[in-house]
Amino acid sequence: MSYSPTAENFAKSYQKDIAQVVWTTLVADLETPVSAMLKLADGRSNTFLLESVEGGKVRGRFSIIGMNPDLIWKFSREDVFINRKARTDSKSFEKINDSPIDSLRSLIAESSIDLPEGLPPMAAGLFGYMGYDAVRLSEKIPDNNNDDLGVPDGLFLRPSLICIFDRLEDIVTLVTPVWPKSGVSSEAAYEAATERLSAAVSDLQRSLPFRRERLVGSKQIDEPLSNTSREEFHEMVNTAKDYINAGDIFQVVPSQRFSIPFDLQPMALYRSLRRLNPSPYLFFFDFDEFSIVGSSPEILVTLRDETVTLRPLAGTRKRGANTEEDKALAKELLEDPKERAEHLMLLDLGRNDVG
């Protein structure tokens, strides 16, 4: 098996204290992102799978698996924690005396790697989420809600193994980032990197792990429970209208959280969502104490080569019974003044945020 770069070229960058990646490429026409996730993760925590689906039917070009983080960063309210021993102890967090935004900016700069030409842009870096409550880091918004979930407001992993599926080329690229460490020679660092890649290749070549566990849940499905009553939700909507009429706000999203018992593995929920949901972007994060499973109909924002791209969606219609009805509904959406105004508002909001 061949690895890139060569040990000689790796040593040249390593001795200059330059972070870099080591990678290998395999043919992947018989593998899927889900099967690879099951083989590579195999019950490990702090793993993730990001998939793109074009049009809800045809799998998109890139899907990404990440695992074995060497570093985990998280924050709750104003408290920031980092674990630089994540490979050996996933709970070894230390508190940082810095703001969440400043510490994350520093970590992004620390984790930045100039990738060789030809590698996808997601071949190294930080992967995770920022929750809605993170808005309070930049806006003075009161927080009168109880923290009844107890999950971090933001959490990012720095995986030491990244598996990138390229459906256009039918290949999978296995990547391991390497940050120079004092006392570790370039030879030892390169050997460790190639061993990580070799182990991943072996995992991909084996059969799917067999477990004696149920693949379907109970036939009796409980009714979802909301965290608010119908009357309370109506009052929230009326209050929002009052704020809009008073000129205090011009957009708000009233929400409620539904909960239901789930006795299967989180991956089972993701697989069901993947099959049934038409949204083109799906994500699965399996952390130590909780998991996040979801999908999105839009990219929303992309930053690449110093260019910010906003692609907000607005306006919905029920799908037509045939192609002709779909085209008519699409034309109706494009000509609807209300939908056009909402698009312009979302673009203005995005421009304001970027500015």
Regions found by a protein language model. Give the residues of each.
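Extended alpha-helical targeting/anchoring segments
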Residues: 1-355
